[in-house]
Amino acid sequence: MKLGRRKFLGLGSAALVGLSLKREKKIEGSFVNDSFQMGHLLRDRASFPEAKRKEKLPVVIVGGGIAGLSAAWRLHKRGFHDFVLLEMNSQPGGNARWGENEITAYPWAAHYVPVPGPKAVYVRELFEDLGVLRDGQWNERYLAFAPQERLFLYGRWQDGIEPAVGLKQKDREQFQRLEERFAAYRNSGSFTIPLELGLSAKDQALDGLSFSEWLHQQGFDSRLLHWYMNYACRDDYGALASDTSAWAGIHYFSSREVEEKGPLTWPEGNGWITRRLLERVSENIRTNQMVHRITESARGVSVFAGDTEFQAEFVIFAAPTFLAPYLLEKFPGLHDFVYSPWLTANLTLDRYPDSRGAEPSWDTVFLDSPTLGYVDAMHQSLRTFVDRTVWTFYWSLAEGAPAQNRQLLLEKDWAYWKEAILHDLERVHSDIRQCVSRIDIMRMGHAMIRPAVGSMFSEERHRLSRLDGRILFANSDLSGISIFEEAQYHGVEAAQKVFKKLHG
């Protein structure tokens, strides 16, 4: 039985459980890292207790994702240690958090970084500091091992995610022609990482179209080509191609150097980077610190978290920008910041399931699935024999309004999502239920900013990124896309501005 997304998500938990009750062994699990209750306190303008104590220091960083950690890393490298980073959750990292069990460490969200090009100066500097890049050479241990990617389509496997099986001559010609278009945009110098180094008004018209509209206008109508473009948008932006700015869609394929090596990955995904950053700045980090108010005066900035008022000269606001109107006094509402909800899950496997004769791959995708597939945390293992593993399963809820999908995440229980995940995997791995012993699920209502049509040249975002007062914004959403390089760039830039203000 093949179910479309709407019909599938319309099934109740009982109906899904009934699909396999007779043959399923008991699978443990739960929702993990849920922090939406705290976020909803801010949304609902809840009252918080008055501060009982004060702490004075030059710099406060709000938010412990990659942007905040990168700001801390840069300050630390400059020899400046008189700052504190406040993180709402018990574990820093944001979209680069990780988990660990008796088998392996594993990612909770971002799981790789493409090999950065020469313009990504800060990322390359970081990777030199972490030992990933030495004397211009990438450490082979951190490059994804082969086989890297596989796609299941038409009852068989193929290497790579771009469809190559079942293509007609028209499909091949369109894939080739589109790659030539992307190469031309790449050579134009307007599509760069970091994004703002190349952003040019001459390409602004592309922002007024959706990516799917642009593809059709250019004469691309291959079903498999549109599936692949749509998959890319769901994977990187949490949005359908029809909801993605054409500029952003082109940027995905035209912004990176043509590089055979890569991507860079670790068992815990980008959590490995988080861990290495924490080794350097852990003394400055305060976890379980929910910031609930920020006020600014001529004397400085006060950040209220828990029972403490942190009095600072400067604040680096590295938390998602959509929180600013709920935290900062007289901060205007935001219109160009739309966020995509995601669900991720980590499945503990006591053995590998049947894969129809295929060798395990790092990244696995199914054609026409509403989900994004899974990555194998043990793929980078140097062990000669691997029997147990953890699969990290990704699902960007891209179809429909983000607010409705956030509500769906909250309304459905763990059993419902467990069945949804297993049902998707069963299309290829028929014995998956006999292999899985645990499924832990993380719900992220505002996982990443969505590069909606008309948003990439947003004056609202550019204005916030140019602010040069006591409060500096630093989240990746200032770029309109949520990728590691942009988060790190904004974090480092904000730290450098603050350091210059303090030291001249």
Where are these regions (language model features)?
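N-terminal secretory signal peptides and thylakoid transit peptides that target proteins
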Residues: 1-15
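Conserved flavin/dinucleotide-binding core of flavoenzymes
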Residues: 20-48, 154, 160-163, 354-504
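Beta1/beta-strand and adjacent pyrophosphate-binding region of the FAD-binding site
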Residues: 54-65
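N-terminal Rossmann-fold NAD(P) dinucleotide-binding loop
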Residues: 68
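Glycine-rich FAD pyrophosphate-binding loop
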Residues: 76-99
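Dinucleotide-binding Rossmann-like beta1-alpha1 core, especially the glycine-rich loop
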Residues: 102-184
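Active-site/ligand-binding neighborhood in enzyme catalytic cores
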Residues: 190-293, 298
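Mid-domain catalytic core of redox enzymes
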Residues: 287-392, 428
